[in-house]
C-alpha cells in the first residue's frame, strides 16, 4: 500500500492565514467539492469556551477566501467540524454539540448540503456521549470511529448505509489508554487503516488495520504521541498523516505512515506552535493542501499551507 523504499522529501511552498476574525479560530477540516475549496472550523472566545460556532469558508483558487456560512445552535458549543464526501453527491458535515456548564455532555450532529453554502438542519447521529470523530465511505457504506467522552473510555466503530443512521459495527474497537481522536482511510483493495490518538498510559498512537467486513482489527503501537490525527492516501499509495507532535517543540506536522513496519515518520513541520493541530488534508494538482490552526503568531488563527512532495 505504500512505497517505503522511496525516499520522500517535502517542502512548504506557501502558507496563508485564512481564518482570523474570531478571538479563537481552530479545529479545521478541508475538502474540495463541486470544483471549489471549503474549509470548516470553530470560532469562539477560547479553546474551551461554550460559545463555539462553525464557520465554513470557500474559495475557487485556495488563495482568496469568503464566508459560505456560519452554523450555530443556541446554548450549544459546536466543536471540531469534519467533512464527509458522500457518494450521492451531497456534502456532509459532522461535529460535536457540547452542552452543560459544569459537566459537559457531547452529542454528534450532522448537516447535509448540495452546494456547501446552504446546510439543512442538524440531525443527531450515533449515541450520546460517544463522539464520532471522522467518517469515510467505502463500498456503499459509511464507517466512523467514535470515542467515549466519559468513563469507561473506549473507541467504537460505526457503520451506516445512509450516513445518518449509525449502527454499532465494532462496539469495542480499542479500550486501553483513553483512545479518542482518529483518522480513517480505505485502500483500493478494501483494507481499512485507522490512526488512533491515546491520552493515558504510554499515550502512544495506535495504527489499526482490518479487511472487509471490518469486524476484526489488528493494532500496532507506533511509539509516538500524536494529537488531531487525520490520514490521506495519495494516488501512488503513500499514506500521509497530519498530526500534532509533542517531542521537542509542539508543532503541526505532516508524517509518512508505513503500515507494514508500524512507523510514523515526520516529513515536514508546518509553521506552527503553541495551541496548534487539527489539520485537514487534500491532494490536488500534485500538491498537498493542508488546513490547520496555530497560535505561533499570537492569536489562534486558521492557516492554509501548500506542500510539495518529491521522491
Where are these regions (language model features)?
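Beta-rich carbohydrate-recognition and catalytic domains
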Residues: 1-23, 31-78, 85-274, 283-311
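C-terminal structured domain segments
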Residues: 278-280
Amino acid at each position: 500500500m505504500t512505497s517505503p523504499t522511496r525516499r520522500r522529501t517535502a517542502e512548504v511552498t506557501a502558507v496563508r492565514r485564512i481564518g482570523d476574525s474570531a478571538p479563537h479560530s481552530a479545529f479545521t477540516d478541508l475538502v474540495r467539492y463541486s470544483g471549489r475549496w471549503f474549509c470548516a472550523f470553530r470560532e469562539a472566545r477560547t479553546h474551551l469556551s461554550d460559545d463555539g460556532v462553525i464557520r465554513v469558508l470557500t474559495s475557487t483558487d485556495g488563495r482568496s477566501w469568503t464566508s459560505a456560512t456560519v452554523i450555530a445552535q443556541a446554548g450549544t458549543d459546536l466543536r471540531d467540524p469534519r467533512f464527509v464526501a458522500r457518494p450521492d453527491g451531497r456534502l456532509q458535515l459532522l461535529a460535536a454539540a457540547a452542552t452543560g456548564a459544569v459537566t459537559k455532555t457531547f452529542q454528534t450532529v450532522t448537516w447535509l448540503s448540495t452546494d456547501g453554502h446552504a446546510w439543512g438542519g442538524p440531525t443527531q447521529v450515533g449515541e450520546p456521549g460517544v463522539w464520532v470523530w471522522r467518517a469515510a465511505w467505502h463500498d456503499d457504506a459509511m464507517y466512523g470511529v467514535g470515542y467515549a467522552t466519559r468513563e469507561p473510555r473506549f473507541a467504537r466503530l460505526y457503520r451506516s448505509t445512509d450516513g445518518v443512521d449509525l449502527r454499532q459495527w465494532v462496539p469495542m474497537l480499542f479500550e486501553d489508554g483513553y483512545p479518542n481522536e482518529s483518522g480513517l482511510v480505505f485502500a483500493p483493495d478494501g483494507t481499512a487503516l485507522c490512526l488512533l490518538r491515546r491520552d493515558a498510559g504510554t499515550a502512544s498512537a495506535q495504527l489499526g488495520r482490518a479487511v472487509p467486513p471490518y469486524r476484526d482489527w489488528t493494532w500496532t503501537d507506533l511509539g509516538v504521541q500524536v494529537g488531531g490525527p487525520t490520514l490521506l492516501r495519495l494516488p501512488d499509495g503513500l499514506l500521509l498523516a497530519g498530526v500534532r507532535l509533542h517531542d521537542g517543540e509542539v508543532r503541526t506536522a505532516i508524517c509518512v505512515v508505513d503500515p507494514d513496519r508500524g512507523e510514523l515518520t515526520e516529513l515536514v513541520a508546518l509553521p506552527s506552535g503553541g495551541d496548534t493541530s487539527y489539520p485537514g488534508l487534500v491532494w490536488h494538482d500534485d500538491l498537498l493542501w493542508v488546513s490547520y490552526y496555530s497560535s505561533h503568531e499570537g492569536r489562534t488563527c486558521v492557516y492554509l499551507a501548500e506542500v510539495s512532495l518529491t521522491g
